[in-house]
Amino acid sequence: MSPQTETKASVGFKAGVKEYKLTYYTPDYETKDTDILAAFRVTPQPGVPPEEAGAAVAAESSTGTWTTVWTDGLTSLDRYKGRCYHIEPVPGEESQFIAYVAYPLDLFEEGSVTNMFTSIVGNVFGFKALRALRLEDLRIPPAYVKTFQGPPHGIQVERDKLNKYGRPLLGCTIKPKLGLSAKNYGRAVYECLRGGLDFTKDDENVNSQPFMRWRDRFVFCAEALYKAQAETGEIKGHYLNATAGTCEEMNKRAVFARELGVPIVMHDYLTGGFTANTSLAHYCRDNGLLLHIHRAMHAVIDRQKNHGIHFRVLAKALRMSGGDHIHAGTVVGKLEGERDITSGFVDLLRDDFVKKDRSRGIYFTQDWVSLPGVLPVASGGIHVWHMPALTEIFGDDSVLQFGGGTLGHPWGNAPGAVANRVALEACVQARNEGRDLAREGNDIIREASKWSPELAA
């Protein structure tokens, strides 16, 4: 090597790990109306100060990397960087903190939940300085909300399409979820809808298996709901699961559902992905289909208390991506869910404006401007004796979905549906008359059972 090109190790650029808090911890920062705000539950590694941990989250989820790079000088770091602007301890937890991070709106592609999540949670959860990290909440500014279509139709349009007002809607997941032939599956759909339910549903893992291909299921379910409609005079629906291995196949199934004239299709939005879900939501709006969303895989992401993403964030993401219904727990059934926390994200799904309320887990005031609302679906281990509590907790703008609570009736599927419809009508009437569902719920069901042998069974 010539003297002119020889390089010694002691000469030239020296890379080194920098302290993130020098650049990304800015406690004096005043948040802007256009910032996306995030609340992270941070558990730093021993010896890592909370300010450094919070700054690391802000850096790694925005413009930062582990060292200074030459190209930092080619952009306006101050304009584009995320900022950790506040840190507070978690009550009762010595080593956990809530780190509040503000992100400039220009960091995100318009109308893309995929890009938003890739930026905010895509890489930082594996960061060495953190023992655990959980995204507790996001504040989506109106300027970003307005770049999304959101739910294909929303609550009021759905009620108008179905001509159903003044009560929760009733549904049922067909069981067993796997193994039925398409014809027997359609028979169960007919019996439930004929008995008085508004909807029946494919389970989340019913796609197109050898025992029941999707096209056969769609045809027999459409036949069942048209027959039930003709006999009851009510508009009925079955959530036809369009989830598939490719977006092209998913779209093909949605097109076939539209050609059959059914009112609603379904998608597993977490396993299917946000890009696929948003594409399907756009198709549903353009073609008059309602879209039911199942949250399969959510507990992998949201169940741990100190690591992952809280469901309220996933619920907000769904409202942006698009869906007319989404499963939201039950409070009283077989699946985990606290009442105050559940009511918090139910309001975030339905309401136009939700104020900050830490007692319900809402870290930021959220203004959805004109984005349509989403109906929460209560599903999982519920039956007629839960009806008073469900009616009180979820109110009219909800779907109460009973699987085993319908199909497990000793007299069969149709009597199970009758029992659910009678129980719901009794609870709604009692509530409208001023009775206390929480205190008198069991008495209301017992009184109704005197006039309904199906409910008394």
Curated annotation (Swiss-Prot):
Subcellular location: Plastid, Chloroplast
Family stated for the protein in its record: Belongs to the RuBisCO large chain family. Type I subfamily.
Annotated binding of Mg(2+), by residue: 201, 203-204
Active site feature: 175, 294
GO CC annotation: chloroplast
Positions carrying N6,N6,N6-trimethyllysine: 14
Top EC class, one word: lyase
Post-translational modification: The disulfide bond which can form in the large chain dimeric partners within the hexadecamer appears to be associated with oxidative stress and protein turnover.
Name of this protein: Ribulose bisphosphate carboxylase large chain
A Pfam short name: RuBisCO_large_N
